[in-house]
Amino acid sequence: MYLSKIELFGFKSFAHRVRIHFDKGLTAIVGPNGCGKTNVVDAIRWVLGEQKSMLLRSPKMENIIFNGTKRLKPLSFTEVSITIENTRNILPTEYTEVTVTRRLYRNGDSDYLLNMVPCRLKDILDLFADTGMGSDAYSVIELKMIEEIISNKSEERLKLFEEAAGITRYKQRRKQTFRQLESASRDLARVDDVLAEVEKKVRNLRLQVRKAERLKEIREELRTLDLTLSAISMDEHLQKLRPLLDSIAAEERQCHELAATIAKLDSAHQESELRQLELERKLADAQKELNASNQLVHTLEKQLLQHKEKQKNLLQTIERLNYSIADKGRKRLEQEALSKELSEKQTPLQEVCTAQLAEFERLKKQEVELNSALDASRQALQSERRAVAELQKSLNALNLTRQSLRTRKEHLEGSVNRLDQRKRDLERSMEQAEPERRRTSEAIEEKKIALDELKKEEERLVALKASITEQSEKKKEELLSLKSEHNHLNNRIALCNSILEKFEGLPEGVAFLEKQRAGKPGLGCLSDLISVRENDKKAINAALGESLGYYLCRNLEEARLAVSSLAKADKGKVHFLILDLIDGGAKIDYAEIEGARRAIDLVETPAELSKALNLLLQHCYVVADLDAAEQLGKKHPEALFITEKGEKFTRRGMLYGGSAKGGESVRLGKKAERDRLQKQMAGMAETIAEAENALAVLRKEFSAIDTERVKRAAASISQEISALEKRLARLEAEERSGADQIAHADRERTALIASMQSVLDELEKTQPETLRIEAEIETAQQKVNVMQEELSAGESRSRALHAELQAQQGRYRDAQLDLEKHRFRASACQQTIVTLSDEIEGMQHQIARAEKEVAELGQSIAQATAEHEQAVVVSARQQEALNELESSYRDLQTKNHDTLSNLRDLRRKHDLSQQMLAEFNNRKAKLEQEIAHLQATVMERYGVELEMMPAHVPEGFDVAASRERLAYLQKQKEQFGGVNELALEEYESEKERLDFLTAQKEDLVSAEKQLRETIEEINRTALEKFRETFNQVRKNFIRIFHDLFDPEDEVDLLITTSDEDPLEAHIQIVAKPRGKKPLAIEQLSGGEKALTALSLLFAIYLVKPSPFCILDEVDAPLDDANVGRFIKLLKKFENNTQFIIVTHNKKSMASCQALYGVTMEEEGVSKLIPVKIENARSEETAS
């Protein structure tokens, strides 16, 4: 069985879908830091069900989804799948290839799939539980887990052992069982509370039944009186209603007549209104037509005015254009004359311009020749000046050097003097600080002695306090256990009392006889007179059967009295067992049968009942199971064999068995059990009181211990010591600093004196060189002055020639400018002539168009004038028709006004009639409402219809006295207060509920006992498996450790179990390699700790190997020699376990059969490159 494939998509840096195929043996995953190697390990841990994002190196779970790069967008989900070859059936499934898939979406949704079938996280965890392959098992080992395994905290080591022992399921089951036990205890407490409440309620209901019967009698009398008085009131209201109905009928007739007249007149008015509306419509249409005609007249007038105005404007435009054409023709003639004159003047101006240019060229040539000679003189002068500057620069540098040497000499002399003064000051300060340092040191020693004494006192008090706390906790746990047991006993006693007091499980007749406590005939029911151990109750229940309900009497007289009581009370029949009539002389032979117990021996009973039990249990034997009963039944056909579960078997072929629920007597031995429990409870109460007293004494002792005072004193002294130590350290540092400064000052003074001598030597050397440079500077400066005078004379001649050249250039430019002006004016005249010609031609075209448009407008004006005259005639005719319609409309409007006035008078009369009718109807409604109220009240109270009762009053019926009697009865009824009228039904219901709760309590007590037994069984089984696994791992650990280190090294695994929880153990690793004696394992080197942890892991693999193991850089702290041992260890286990190693070590890589390189060619995106080592080696050999 091995991990064959893993597929990643969108997980952390794996943006693209990646598949990794693994073979058996060793596989390495390599690559530089930060490329995403460990992301592969995180993916395997995540798909195995890891829920803590911090273990996946992420603050929240959604961060494991690829978050995008500069080029790639973030993904919306991630998916990881692993495929496991289940060839050894380690996983509890029928499939040989198991693929587990987990998806996570960015919105928080997630999916789990098992062989591509959706499932739950619990299914995944259950699949890998106790296989060594879970997300927190030892199949994935990181370097930090090595530290955790070696650390003082043993929780991680304990998890490894639990996984190897396969007790994870047991602990989970035990946890569930504990929760069920707590739930059962809470339910039992609730049932006890409810039982007490229900019993109280049943007693109250008995009183309410009697109260309800008395109230029923009062209600019957109330009903008779109330119905009679209601019938009388009904008759009085009917007599008032009859005349009112006649008045309503008369008013309704008058209303109908007025309504008919109003309707007729209203119809005529509506027809007239319709005619008026028709006239209004015609008026509107006529007005609309008249408005349209007037609008047309107005439009035509406006159009005529526009045409005339436009014609006038066009004529003015033609006149203006003719004037412009004449003016522009005159201007064109003037420009043509000017152009001819300018052309004649251009030739002489051109000749003058040529002569001025020749003179300018001659002067320009003379200036160039003179400037060349001056440039040569300037260069020579500049060269001489640079030579003088270099000499001056050398002189200045030399002078600066000498000045610097003199300044340095003065500075060195001052430094020597300051150093001498500083040395004297330091020596004086050190002498003054020595007494203070000695006093501070002595004070520190005294304070430390006092602090040690306080710490010893504090340790003593803390130890005493811890001892008292431990004793208190033990007492609390003991007291809690005692109180819990006390409550449990109390509940069991209450249950026994409930069963005994309610006579559950007894026939009706026996229960009746048991209730007669005073003067009860006989001894009582058999089930109350015997006692049986809990384990034997089922067997004795089956053996005695119905006999448990027999009623025992001493003699026949007691039995006759009991029969007589039953007959009088009609309580049915009862089986009686009369002790005097049982033949006790004949001895019953109870043969001893091997493998069976006599039933009579399992029953505790008074001596006087032994004859009855011998009779009932003769030849009854109890065996372990039904197989034993069958075998013994063949050998002893005369006997009856009963199993411990209550199954009966006889040789005659009869078998009695099945579920025990409802078929057993719940009273069997309850009385004896109650007496026994009461004795235990009394003794336990004394024990609880003693434990409470002891706890109070411990609390008093604990409160008397004042560790805070000692802590405060110690803290105060520690602060003083700290201040003194700081002061001493400061003084010592000042002393060391002073000594160092004195030594440094001596060294610095020696160096300064040597430097001063060197400065003096240098000053003497530079004096001759200074004098030589000053002489050379003076000679060179004289030569420069001569050359400067010659250059100044040449520059004067150059300036005069340049001025003459500038004047000639001005004269040439003036001649050229005159010539250009004449040329420009001639060109402008020609352009003006062309422009004027174009404008004249355009204006002539405009005049032609305007004259054409004037002719067209004349025709439009004539046509518009004719249309306007016709529109005026039509508008006049429409105005006459509108005046006739308005006259007819005013006449009809007057007539309609008169009709509407008559209608208002009639409607006013009709409204008055309706008001009278409404008043009569209100009075009628009030009477009918009172009648209906009487009927509804009677119907609501008594469920009868009032009109169906006789209306006559009985003779001698006094209405006033009856009303007083009615009020008295109602007051009596109110004095009863709240009465449960369904008390009898509720009483029967609550009684049934009480019986049900009693049975439920028994079930809970039984369940609680069974759960405690289950927890004990789980603890026992899991502890056996854990101890067996621990012993095997311990032997393997010692052997592997000796293989990796030295056989003489001291190594062991120690275990310390807890009395409170046997499965919570402390496992300690003892490892002392190469003769070292470390006080704690944390003191070992990194490599030694890593090999020790690996020894423990592989020791566990020898007991329960994981099909695959992922080692994430666990070889990082190992040197080459230890890496060799590590690889050798892996080779031993590779046949049974597949190893996947994340490593940077070359030796580890070389030992693997396959390599997977993880790179990050694109920033933020991991890429996988597979390499087969064997193929690579073959290619290397071939080459």
From Swiss-Prot:
UniProt organism field: Chlorobaculum tepidum (strain ATCC 49652 / DSM 12025 / NBRC 103806 / TLS)
Domain SMC hinge positions: 523-632
Record-stated family: Belongs to the SMC family.
Residue ranges the record marks as coiled coil: 167-322, 358-497, 669-941, 980-1025
Domain of life according to the entry: Bacteria
Keywords: ATP-binding, Coiled coil, Cytoplasm, DNA-binding, Nucleotide-binding
Function: Required for chromosome condensation and partitioning.
Molecular-function annotations in GO: ATP binding; ATP hydrolysis activity; DNA binding
Lineage of source species: Bacteria, Pseudomonadati, Chlorobiota, Chlorobiia, Chlorobiales
Keyword Nucleotide-binding tagged: yes
Domain notes: Contains large globular domains required for ATP hydrolysis at each terminus and a third globular domain forming a flexible SMC hinge near the middle of the molecule. These domains are separated by coiled-coil structures.
GO cellular component: chromosome; cytoplasm
Region (Disordered): 409-442
InterPro entries (alphabetical): P-loop_NTPase, RecF/RecN/SMC_N, SMC, SMC_hinge, SMC_hinge_sf, SMC_prok
Record-linked Pfam families: SMC_hinge, SMC_N
Protein name: Chromosome partition protein Smc
Entry's localization field: Cytoplasm
Subunit-level organization: Homodimer.
Biased composition, class Basic and acidic residues, residue ranges: 419-442
GO BP field: chromosome condensation; chromosome segregation; DNA replication; sister chromatid cohesion
UniProt: ATP binding residues: P32, N33, G34, C35, G36, K37, T38, N39
